Amino acid sequence: MDYLTHKLLDPTRAKSCIQSIQRDQSLWKDGKSTAGLYASKVKNNLQLDKKSKVSIDNSNLIIKAIISDLLVKSFTIPRKVHGVMFSKSSKGNSYGMHLDNAYMSTGRSDLSFTLFLSDPGEYEGGELAIETIQETRKIKLPQGHIIIYPSTTLHSVEEVTSGTRIVCVGWIQSYIPNNEDRKILFSLDAGAKGLLAAHGQSHELDLVFQSYNNLLRRLGG
């Protein structure tokens, strides 16, 4: 599995976040200011001033939710969640195909995430399009759900044709930089935890957890 979709926030918390960041419209700036040289040419949206108190406070709440979620932790093995920002797209806005920078001022981007804050019934279009070798997957998730995918992936945001799409985006620097290594560890962790839940602790399972942690040591970067 190259990407993870998961309910991170309940709809009430997502709505509360939207109300908070929408209170002062003067804090929303041209999104081109946070894009790289190439990406800025295809970026057409608004972003909340990252230095504002409301952005910092809500970013910290979302970072806390990410690093405390057991499934997300197992999938990402996070060293650092960084570059968190809030994006707003209204009718006519889009973000063309691009690749996230490998290194940012806040850290290395191993994984990218989009947390859907708006109810999908409140806007048309605005799907996150992730390009794979064989196809382009278009993703539009329920309110409060997150998608996490490798930052090595080309992706875009389809044009919003009506309503307003508000999301939180950011990056994760993992203890395991390589995507294939993370996938192996994720499967091993899921299998071991499943066996523990089904059969309880055993010496054989201790050996599996030992191998998992020793792989973390060997593959960590």
Swiss-Prot record:
Q: Where does Fe cation bind?
A: H98, D100, H155
Against Gene3D superfamilies, the record matches this protein to:
q2cbj1_9rhob like domain, Rabenosyn, Rab binding domain
Fe2OG dioxygenase domain boundaries: 80-174
Q: Which GO terms describe its molecular function?
A: 2-oxoglutarate-dependent dioxygenase activity; iron ion binding; L-ascorbic acid binding
- Name any cofactors this protein relies on: Fe(2+); L-ascorbate
Q: Which GO terms describe its biological process?
A: DNA damage response; intracellular iron ion homeostasis
Instruction: Look up the EC number in the record and give it.
Output: 1.14.11.-
Q: Protein name, please?
A: PKHD-type hydroxylase Pro_1271
Give the species this sequence originates from. Prochlorococcus marinus (strain SARG / CCMP1375 / SS120)
